[in-house]
Amino acid sequence: MYGLIPMSCRRSVLALPFLCAIAAAADLVDFNRDVRPILSDRCFGCHGPDANKGRKAGLRLDEFAGATKQLKSGDTAIVPGDLKRSAVIARLNNTDPDEVMPPPELHRPLSAAEKDILTRWIAQGAKYDPHWAFVSPKQHPAPPVKATDWPKDPLDRFILAKAEAAGLRPSAPADRATWLRRVSLVLTGLPPTPAEVEAFLGDQSADAFEKKVDALLASPRYGEHLAVAWMDLARYADTWGYTGDNRMFAWPWRDWVLRAFNENLPYDRFLTEQLAGDLLPDATQDQRVATAFNRLHRMTFEGGSIAEEFRQDGINDRVMTAGYAFMGLTVECARCHDHKYDPISQRDFYSLAAMFGDQNENGLLPYHGEVPPPFVRLFKSDEERAKERRLRDAVTAAERALSAVPPTEATISTVTVPTPVVHLPLETFTKSGVDNAIAGGKPAKFERRGAPEDLQLVPGVQGQAIKFDGDAGFILSDFRQIGRFDPLTFSAFLRLGEKNARATVLHSTGFYTGDGDATGIELLVDHGKLRWSMIHLWPNSAASIETVDELPVGAWRRVTGTYDGSSRAAGLHLYLDGREVPTKVIRDTLHAKPRDNALEIATRSRDAGFRNGSLDEIQVWRQALTGAEVATLHGLAPTTWPAGLAREHARLRADAAYATAWAALQKARRELAAHQETAPAFYAMEHSPLAPPTYVLTRGDYDKPEKDKLCPPGAPASVYPWDPKLSRDRLGLSRWLTDPRHPLTSRVIVNRLWAQVFGNGLVASTENFGLQSDDPTHPELLDTLAVDFVRGGWNTKALLRRLVLSATFRQASTPTAAAREKDPANRWLARGPVLRLTSEMIRDQALLAAGTLVEKVGGDSAQENARRRSLYTFRKRTAPPDSMLIFDAGSREVCQPRRLNTNTPLQALVLLNNPLFAESAQKLAAKVATVTSNPRDQIALAFRTVCTREARPTELTALERLYADQKALVAAEVPAPPPPAPDAKTKKAVAKPADPAMVALTRVCATVFASDAAVTSR
């Protein structure tokens, strides 16, 4: 019977199963493509990952298990394959405003098509697929295409296949001048000069395009251009922000970025050095400078600011910035609660925060403008760096030599306490101060805070003592120069009148604007415990110890603190009544010398003094007393001394070998410190075991840590599992991010570079690869490029070279009628990219055309009217350059992962009236006027200089008409020359009348700068 069927019909019958399969595939709902966008946009806000804000009805729709489990009501939201039992279907089609989903107050009703998608999806089994961006990328073979002679690179076949499927054909190649302008702007941010265009057009060699791209990639301009987008991500600025908005000398980090791009530092190292350069073995100065990426957030020194609040804000900013820059995720949404859309919990956020909060730091800026620690010293030359290494080695050798000195055999029969340089008996006081009992010693002056009559004479241990009110106190104005290598001893009888939360007993730190400004020697009572410190800047650059036990209230105790000048916490000791007491180390990282302030007692400006506390018999030595001397000072008999105290005293006072070794060590330390202090300090990261633990903060509030939710350092396992072999620190985080199988890191940077070349990313939401992201237009291409990028050594220049030499990039940008109708946004890339230049490119182009661009690479930032490239323009966070803001640059207060182009009348006003553009128009007019005197040729040359092409006849005619109109207008306005000065001695210059032709030509040049041809790359 089959043989009776005609051949044509027989072929149709054979094709039926294939056609049915195609129809079935077309009808099959894809979860990631069709369903997830609907659920994410309409449902996840109430039924998503966030459990903290009371997930509605206990229903979770972002995962299969949650969507298909039975609810307390007895209903099941989704029963795969069963529409009648799936409560979601009934809710979608309900007309009751109290029952329908999404609820009317969301103002996002589902369309009929969206309801149909969800219905068919459930009917087909409600299959859940993981979000595409959380699946490791894999390489795909280039698809077959019809126009096989068009692709120049395998990536072109991915583009062409999509275009052909959409019924589009690729555009013809752009002319060579257009391509040259396009590629020059993409790779360097500057257009080619007329001479460069002429040279390229004259090069007819087979590899002319490749040679030009290689030259652009080798230019210093390349790194300057690529750095701008990274500076947006890193929130680079030249001031700290907030009210004071003080100067922030951050440009060494910017210069590191320039060098990294120009030297083609592999992206995995680029990432690692910025996140954790300080944790690399034998970290170099440059690698530590790179970590300033984490320190570029805003800070303040404003009085009344709470250090912990701003410390937490800074850490949160670091987490947010790293999330955007390296993962393309909005992780900051999980600061207050579990992420509404992405599988990032609040614990995940604070585990990341533990990575970035590993600093021993203060949340506030030092009031005096010093670099807030931790920091790295910026030595200018290899010789200076080598000298520092030698001096460090010398300190290490001296420490070993000191520890190698054998125990002393010497003994001292009698211990004599040295005479102090200050002794204040405090038997009485006057309005001017208190007497110093040391012969020739100057009295302690009354510090004019509070009133002397507020002090009280009370019975002391030896005669009278003084009880303080917390405001008034005394200052030893001639007792200064207490350096980090200067030994010191303080002793006094002390009585607490109350359990002070904080009380200043002694300090040389000047006035107080927060712990971050404390600098000098300091003895505090902190919640009843004694804290003895030598401080450069608290808390990172300090040596500090604290008693384990609290002082009793109301009892006299003789407190003695000694410091041996070693810059180490081990050199600090505390004694009570002649006996050393147990202490714990609070800080042990003293990096620099304190400021030179006078010694003050019981008072400090803007801080709590020794309120209701009493002092008697204050003594100060410019040396560190030994334990035996302290015991003798208190009258303890040698028979009561701890074992070994006498031998230690003999070692310190009578052992010549030990004294020589100690002097050599202190000399080595001083020489190292002196050399280090010749180099400026610069912001860096430095891991510290003394960093406070990280807890989940309720609603993200700094003062509401949930102590039962300690968060060790970690990363979201829902994004990519953590390898247990990795260290739980920033270096481990960078290794986790640069794992070749990590689903986000390579995709995010490849997509960002694609967007730089083509205007839009393969994923349009370059800043967001989470569940709210746009789907990739060419997912297989994105994955393949990401895999190739990693396998090629994370080579940024190689990837950009590949993109700009592709047939896709070389296309003309003018759309055909069919392309305009089928693909108005150019998603399928059947034509070349059209890009509005950034604010930096527009400004730099004007300076280059005018011949005034100063091409100095690197160095300190310049003011807006300077003629350097725009990335060097001084960026004040509270008042950014207005011309840049108008062209969509940000304030750099926070990370800006993407600039959104706008078109406003203000942009034309900037181009026509901004002083820099006005001056550039004048310079360009003068330049072309020296080449030719013919107005038409002048206009044509000006246009060609700015726009890198010949003006079209209509453009040239319009500009000539403008020139003629402006020349006539100016000629009519020019006044007659003023009469000569009557007095030959008059120094006043005679105004030269304006040249109508030059004024008109200048206005034509300004118009060219403001034209679409100038501000657009086509």
Regions found by a protein language model. Give the residues of each.
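Extracytoplasmic low-complexity segments
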Residues: 382, 387-471, 509-515, 589-592, ...
